[in-house]
């Protein structure tokens, strides 16, 4: 099974296992580390936050299904955890949910803020999302608008 198919099937399984528990997938990595592949799953729970028991429960169920379906093309290690306080922002719904929070965005190419300063990293308060563009009040006092299709990576930042 191709890598993209593995990711797609594991995503489907997590949705099936997690939905009854109120748990959803934040991110999924499937990559080689050393000689083996790693399936790294990051989960969250909207109500009450995810805990170790939730992660262990999903891990057991996912592992059982992976063993039965046996579609993984090679040896792998399964890791299931929370995304942490600097969780990634992947979907439009993530940006909508975390309006007003401090974020860091890295782009594929240099983009200009409102003052014309070009950069690839934008850090500041997420002020909005509309028409595929996120608004950020930068920590330096400027504003920026970043198209989602230019975002290489985005995550929440810890506020002191």
UniProtKB/Swiss-Prot annotation:
Entry keywords, A to Z: Cytoplasm, Ribosome biogenesis
Regions annotated as coiled coil: none
Subcellular location: Cytoplasm
The keyword Cytoplasm appears for this protein: yes
One annotated GO biological process: translation
Keyword Heme: no
Domain of life: Bacteria
Pfam family, one: RimP_N
Family annotation (InterPro entries): Ribosome_maturation_RimP (IPR003728), RimP_C (IPR028998), RimP_C_sf (IPR036847), RimP_N (IPR028989), RimP_N_sf (IPR035956)
NCBIfam families given in the database record: PRK14647.1
Family in the record: Belongs to the RimP family.
Job of this protein: Required for maturation of 30S ribosomal subunits.
Protein name as annotated: Ribosome maturation factor RimP
Originating species: Citrifermentans bemidjiense (strain ATCC BAA-1014 / DSM 16622 / JCM 12645 / Bem) (Geobacter bemidjiensis)
Taxonomic path: Bacteria, Pseudomonadati, Thermodesulfobacteriota, Desulfuromonadia, Geobacterales
């Amino acid at each position: 099974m191709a890598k993209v198919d593995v990711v797609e099937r594991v995503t489907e399984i997590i949705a099936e296992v997690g939905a009854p528990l109120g748990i959803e997938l934040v991110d999924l990595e499937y990559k080689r580390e050393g000689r083996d592949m790693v399936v790294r799953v990051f989960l969250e729970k909207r109500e009450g936050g995810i805990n170790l028991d939730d992660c262990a429960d999903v891990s057991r169920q996912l592992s059982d299904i992976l063993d039965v379906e046996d579609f993984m093309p090679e040896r792998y290690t399964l890791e299931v955890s929370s995304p942490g306080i600097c969780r990634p922002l992947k979907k439009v719904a993530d940006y909508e949910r975390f309006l007003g929070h401090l974020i860091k965005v890295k782009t594929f190419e240099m983009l200009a803020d409102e003052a014309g300063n070009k950069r690839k990293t934008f850090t500041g308060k997420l002020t909005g999302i509309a028409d595929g563009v996120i608004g950020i009040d930068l920590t330096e006092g400027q504003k920026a608008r970043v198209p989602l299709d230019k975002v290489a990576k985005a995550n929440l930042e810890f506020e002191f």
